A protein has these predicted regions:
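N-terminal mature ectodomain segment of secretory-pathway/periplasmic proteins
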Residues: 41-123
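Gly/Pro-enriched, hydrophobic low-complexity segments
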Residues: 38-41, 65, 115, 167-255
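A short, polar/proline- and glycine-enriched secondary-structure boundary/capping micro-motif
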Residues: 73, 105-109, 118, 126-129, ...
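N-terminal secretory signal peptides that target proteins for export/translocation
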Residues: 1-16
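Sec/Tat signal peptide C-region and signal peptidase I cleavage site
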Residues: 32-38
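Flexible, processing/modification-adjacent segments and terminal tails
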Residues: 39-46, 74, 117-181, 242-244, ...
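Bacterial N-terminal signal peptides
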Residues: 19-31
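Conserved short hydrophobic patches within well-ordered secondary structure
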Residues: 13, 54, 197-198
């Protein structure tokens, strides 16, 4: 569009400027809205690529570090760090370990039996749970209150689960995790903000995952960093052999095996 010169003798007043400003704002809004839509689509494509890659692996062996932040009764933010390993053979075998400053725990699932091995307490418990690893994750969450934030990454419907209730998605840019270049994505829903760093290139491995709880005062975070990612698992990885010195007990009798020591946090106070 060709702009014509202004020849009016009167200075351009506020009333004349207002339509110009509104027009500029409208153009900017359309531009920013289009960029946001493109960003959202790009973020979803990258998550879908990661999901397809991860679910395509029939066996997995990964090592990880995790950080969980809690808020004390004095509104002090404290972080607890653990390390561990996850071995998976789809559809129904899982071994996971978590070692921190307060707990050393292992779970083993062979498709029929779940074993929770409390190395600190020198005891273990077993319950019959027939089904897939995904059904196991549901049983642990619904019946025993065990919630593993990073467990979403193991599900075959990981894309649908992670994108459920997402209201905003964006590609932030690039990042480097342990020397590996990654695509940095950010997502929002009503209760949490979460970020993920996915390895760039032919192997879109999730390298870092951060969940921020917006509904809790001080917005504590959970961070998962995947260190090693392999696709081979030893055949006997899902066979549990009890330490002869350990005592077998009922699962309900087992002491607290959470990675956060009892008495550290107050009840989650809503904003």
């Amino acid at each position: 569009m060709k702009l014509m010169p202004v020849t009016a003798k009167k200075p351009i007043g506020r009333a004349t400027k207002l339509p110009i400003l509104l027009g500029t704002a409208l153009i900017m809004g359309i531009s920013l809205g289009s960029q946001a839509g493109a960003q959202s689509n790009d973020a979803e494509k990258l998550i879908k690529g990661m999901a397809d890659y991860v679910t395509g692996q029939k066996t997995l062996s990964i090592t990880y570090d995790s950080d969980i932040e809690v808020i004390t009764s004095k509104l002090q933010k404290i972080q607890f760090t653990s390390s561990g390993q996850v071995q998976l053979s789809r559809p129904d075998k899982l071994r996971a370990t978590r070692t921190g400053g307060y707990r050393d725990v292992e779970i083993v699932f062979d498709g029929k039996m779940l074993t929770v091995n409390n190395k600190d307490g020198k005891d273990y418990a077993q319950i019959e749970v027939a089904g897939t690893t995904e059904e196991l994750i549901d049983v642990l969450r619904e019946n025993h209150g065990v919630v593993a934030p990073g467990a979403d990454l193991l599900l075959t419907n990981v894309f649908n689960v992670m994108m459920n209730d997402v209201v905003e998605a964006a590609v932030i840019g690039k990042g480097v995790i342990d020397g590996v270049e990654c695509d940095h994505l950010a997502f929002r829903n009503m209760e949490t903000d979460w970020q993920i760093w996915i390895e760039s290139g032919a192997n879109p491995i999730p390298r870092k995952y951060v969940i921020t709880s917006k509904g809790i005062a001080e917005a504590p975070q959970y961070t998962l960093r995947i260190k090693e990612w392999k696709t081979d698992v030893a055949p006997d990885a899902f066979t549990f052999k009890a330490d002869p010195s350990f005592k077998k007990i009922a699962l309900g009798e087992m002491s607290d095996i959470d990675e956060v020591p009892q008495g550290t946090t107050k009840a989650g106070e809503k904003k």
